[in-house]
Structure formats: C-alpha cells, structure tokens
Amino acid sequence: MDILKVLSRGTKQAPKKPGVPAATLAQANIPSAGVETNPQLYHDNVGPPPKGKKRKRKSRTQDHDQADDAVDDDVELSDFDFFAPKTRRDSDGAGSKTKAADVKKAKKDADEADKARPIELDECKRILRSHRLKYTLLPVQKAAPAKVEKSSAKKKKKKDKGDKVDGAAQAAQGKSDKLPVFPQPLVSFSQLRSAYRISPRLADNLAKGSYKVPTEVQLGALPLLLQPGFALSHEGDGVDDDGKGGDGEALAMLQGASAGVDFLAIAPTGSGKTLSFLLPAINGVLKRRAEKGETGGDSSNDTKHALEAIVVAPTRELASQIANEGRKLAMGTGVRVVLMRKGMRVAAEEDSTEKKSEDQEEDVFESEDEDSLSEDDEEREKSEKPSKKPNKAPITKADILVTTPMLLLNFLSKGTSTTKKRLPRVRSLILDEADVLLDQLFREQTMGIWSACRNPNLRVSFWSATMASNIETHILDNLRAQADDAPAPPLIRLVVGLKDTAVPNISHRLVYTATESGKLLALRQLLHPASFSTTTSSTTTPEDETPLRPPFLVFVQTIERATALHEELKYDIPAAAGGASRVAVLHSSMPESARAAVIRRFRAADVWVLITTDVLARGVDFAGVNGVVNYDVPGSAAAYVHRAGRTGRAGRKGGIAVTFYTKEDIPFVKNVANVIALSERQAGAGESATQKWLLDALPDVSKKDKKELREKGVESRRSVAASKGKARITSKSAWERRKENNRKGAIEGSKRRKIAARDQGDGSDDGGEWGGIDD
C-alpha cells in the first residue's frame, strides 16, 4: 500500500503528463525553457468569416452567379467516372506515380493562385481587427490654411476664447485628415513567394530561420513595404470613405503608392520589427539588381555593390544585432550587410571642391604633427613630404549599412565646412527606435543623416514600441518640408494593440522597499527566493508566488550605481554554482570589446544576472531572459515599456517585470503604475497587480517633473554626494564604513610619510663634505 496515495486521496491535483516530471512541468512556462510558442500576441474572436469563398462578380447578376456555380459543380462531378473499368498498373508503377505527381503539381499551382489573389475587403477588416492592427493615412501634403475672421472690436477675453475655439477647430480638422486604410494582410510566410514575389533564396533563408507564423507587425507591414500596389489593390484602394469619406487628395496619393510609401510602425517589444524592415530592404536590392541585369552573386566582386539602404540604431549593441540578423537573412543572395565601425569609409559623393578639400585635409594632418616633431624629424619630413600623406581607409562596399548616428555623421561631416558628403543612391532610410533617434539627444545627428540622403525616390520608415505625439509631429513637418521640391509619397501609420503599453504576455510586480537598503534586501530575496511573496497585492495569485529564476536583467539609473551594485552582488552566488562569474555589469563607459564580450557570455548563459543601465533597454533581443528587475524607477512610461520588453520576446510566456520603489520615488511612480494597469487590461487579466487604491493614492506627475525625470532621472540618485549618502548602494553600516575609511586614510598617510622621509634623506646626502657639529 502506498501511504502517499492514501493521504492524498481527498486532494485534487493537476493532471500530469506521462513521462514528464512535475518539476519540469513547473518550469516549462518560462522564457528560458525553450518551449515553442505562438509569436502572435493577439488573435481575438471577432466573428465568423464572410460566407462563401468566391469573389463577387460586379459585371454579372446573382442569377448568373448561381448558374456559374452550378456549371462549376457539374464540371467537378464530370471529372469522376464511378463506373469506369479498373486500369491496369504498369509493372514498375511509373504511370501512377506520374499521375500522382501531376495531381500534386496541379493542387500546388491552384494553392499558389489562391494565395496570389487579393483578399476581400470584409475579410481584410476581420483579420486586421482580430490582430488589433490599426492603419492610418497621415496627411503629408500641406493643407490650405483656414481663413479666420477676427473683428477688431473684440475684447481681450472674447479674443482669447475665440483663439481656443480656433485651436479646437484646427485639432478637429487635423483629426479628420487622418483616414483609416485596410491593406492586404500577410496570412502566412508562403505568401511572400507566391503573392509578393520575393527572391527564392530569401524565402529559403526564412524557412531555415524557423520563421513559421508571422507576428502582428510582420502581418501588417510586409505587404505594404514589399508591394504597396498589391496591398492596396482592393475596392476603394483601401480607404474607408463610407463614414467621413471623400478626401480626393488622399485617394490620389494612395493610387500612386505603387512606387513605395513612407511607413511608421508602433508595435510591442519583441514582435519582429527587425525582420519587418530587413526583408523589404534586402528584397529591394535584389529586385533593382534584377532590373539592371546584375546578379551580384559573387560577393568578391565589389562593382556590384552600391549603398542603397541605411539602418540607424541608437546603440552599438542594437546595431550589431541588426547587422547579424541581416547577414543571416541575406546569406547566399550576394547582398552585403555591413556594420559601420570607427574610421570606416563608405561610398559617398562630394561637391566640386573635392580636390581642394583633400589638400586642406592633408594640411590639417601635417599641422597637427608639427608640434610633436623634433628639428631632425622636420628636416626628414621636408625631404620625404610626398610619402608622408595620411593613409585613408579603403572604401567599404556595402548594399545595406547598419550604423549609429554619430559614426555616420562624423564620416559625412569630416573635412572642412566647404565639403559636404551626400548619399544620392540611398533609396531606403530605416530608423529603428525612431522616438529616441528623433528626440533631443540624437535629433541633430539623425537629421544630418536624413538630409544627406538626396535620392528623389527615398523612402523613410520609422519603427519603435513607443512614439510620442511630438515625435510624430516632427516627422510630419520634415516630410512636408521635403514635399515642397517633389510630390511626397503617402505616410501610413500602423499601431499594433494599445499604443505605449507593455507586452501582454508578462506579469508585473510593484514592490515598495522604503529605502535603498530595502532594495538591496529585496534583490537578494529574488536571488535566493523565500517561501513568502514579495508583492504588494492584498490577494496573491500563483503568478505572484512564482519566483524569478535567472537569467534576468537588473536596470539602474547611473553607471556609478551599476558598478556599486555589481560589487555588492558578485559574491552572492555560491562558488559551486559559478560564483562571481555569474554576475556581470555593462554600461556605456566600458570599451566596445568588453561590452561585446559581456553580451556573448550572457547569450551563452555563462552570466545569470546582468546589471546594466538603459544602454540595453532598447531593441536588444535575449530570447531566454526570464525577467527584468527595475532596481531604480524608470525615467518615463516609455522607458518602462522598453525595459519590461527585454523579457517575453516573440510571444514567450512566463516573463516577470519587477519594479522597486522607495519613499523618494512615490511622486514619480504613477507613470509606471498606469502603464502596468493598461497592459494588464489589454491582456484581459482579471485582477490587476496595481490595485485601484494605489492608483488613486499616488500623486500625479507634473509636466516639469516628467521632463526632468526623463532627462536626468531621480534627483536623489544622480550622485552619492548630492544625496548625502542616502543613495549609496551598500550593505555596510556607517560604523564599518568609517572604520574602513580610517584604515585607508592611515595607510595613505603612512605611505606619504615614508616618501617624504626618503626624499628628505636623499636631499641631505647631496651636499659636500660634512662640517661637523655646530657649537
């Protein structure tokens, strides 16, 4: 008799899969388990598809359609002869094999023809609504200014009131200019070959990369970027003009969209945006080569390569990741994807003063070296002046260039003010994390690159998980400014799900720690989970009780705090489990090689806890990260969305985002609480981790505080000296720190005294003969 079965007879246990241990089942629902999941975040049930698979024929009546259907049925039935004699098979079975192959080929051709046929408008709307995709045609052409009549006899109060009414009217007019569109969705990746005619090698690389189901952003973006004419080919060119309808200018813009569109995509983190812009860029290069009759298959032949696409990313890590993904996707196609490095030169055109600028550049190099040369070196330089010209790096041949803003801008602006390099052959400019690139920190650099791309057929695409309204306005203003010279292509915006919210497949926790010491204690409890929960909810759920398993990321506000936290935690993991090597730190002050080494170790699971700043908050893809710890409160709602998006990539469930906040953070934490509440509402969660009483109790954040927090972070953590030691990350008491500082001071003082005594002794020996002792 099994005593355990007897004692547990009255309890209900979860059914176990045969042959699978319970521990494995408990750990399977986390990102690092490697379980294959559906990458699509949304698949709502919005009703049955429209009845009938046949398209409506406008040129015929309903009776004719029914007659045609009857004829089709008769033809299908006539193909089968139920009373025909049984055919004799060949001895080798060749006839049956040939017939089976013909039937298979005919079926395949019919399937491809079916996939190449546009989907009906109603079905398009149903699919887009099911995946929560919303397209908007943004007005790029300048609208005629509205005539506002103002009376000179109005009083000041009435004038102010009239100005408010005019502003509201202009806002309503701007809203009405934005028309919804319903392009063709990408139902499966097999459509890319049949309907959108991408390169066969590119389709094979997609299959080898295990791309099976398109995500929401891929489902919505790829048709518009690959073949916008086909994507907008259904009735009304995709414009829903039955409600407000009738914007003839917008209709005309969409009818000319076959040459390409400008695109703005706002999609959740980890939803496949990189593939969405790399695939059209590579296919565009191959398509233009085919039109010119160039194969470009031999990568050693540099004459085939011309810079046609530029991808700009805000950080080195993200740029390196994009370049690696591009090389995998372009393998065997002859398209060269290059990551720009310091000192690299790319193909660019200059003005007529190119020769003059080179001479001036040589003079600059020579003038810099003159101060460090001796007289003999100067004479030798004069005799060998022709051979002392600075050696320039060879021009790198690339089809697609991946870069950070400053690297490319330094190359374009290198030289004197009379030389301006241009990139006239670039036809595609891609801004990944566009809200950061067009913010104040990178705006000047990004606009310098944008203005250098002078191709009249230039198409610009903007990608991010968050997009503020002022960034959208800035994009529209720049596109309108360029529309003065030539007709502007249409700008289509795609929003996946709710704007500026975190991914719905992760859970969120807000933990109040009161002080900095409480943060350190809470983080150590995550490293060594206790039997109790650390959530603030009054009702705990199984998700709240789930411990955070490594690997995970820890985000802090400054480099100084990242280094201090690493010193505190590096010995918390036992030596038997790897010890200090399991905890690493990464920030922008580290050399590029050291940062790359840390990233490699983290991807290889040699590092379990990676402490970092916001340098890793955007774009970097770690598939197996189980969670994110916001040790310091993020500076904005967008920063929280991107930090939390490092887990739960590609639809993986089980990720956890933990945020610590102290007494000093209470005035600023409501931004994070609002994002958590919206994200859980979007996911359809029953009970939110952010209780309503907490949202009501937290104070609202003013615009001034939001701006200061976004630019500089929480004031008390900017430096230890400014906070009078309150923001110090340490587990030592004040007495221990004082004793340690006194010991260090005593050692330093002893060293100084020894050095002074030695110097004094050396000085006394330098004199002449000893003259004896004075009386």
From Swiss-Prot:
Biased composition range(s): Acidic residues: 68-79, 359-379, 762-775
Ranges where the record places region Disordered: 1-113, 144-177, 346-396, 708-775
Positions of the Helicase C-terminal domain: 533-698
A biological process term (GO) from this entry: maturation of SSU-rRNA
EC number(s) recorded for this UniProt protein: 3.6.4.13
Function, in words: ATP-dependent RNA helicase involved in 40S ribosomal subunit biogenesis. Required for the processing and cleavage of 35S pre-rRNA at sites A0, A1, and A2, leading to mature 18S rRNA.
Assembly and binders: Interacts with the U3 snoRNA and is associated with the 90S and 40S pre-ribosomes.
Listed name of the protein: ATP-dependent RNA helicase ROK1
Lineage: Eukaryota, Fungi, Dikarya, Ascomycota, Pezizomycotina
Gene assigned in the entry: ROK1
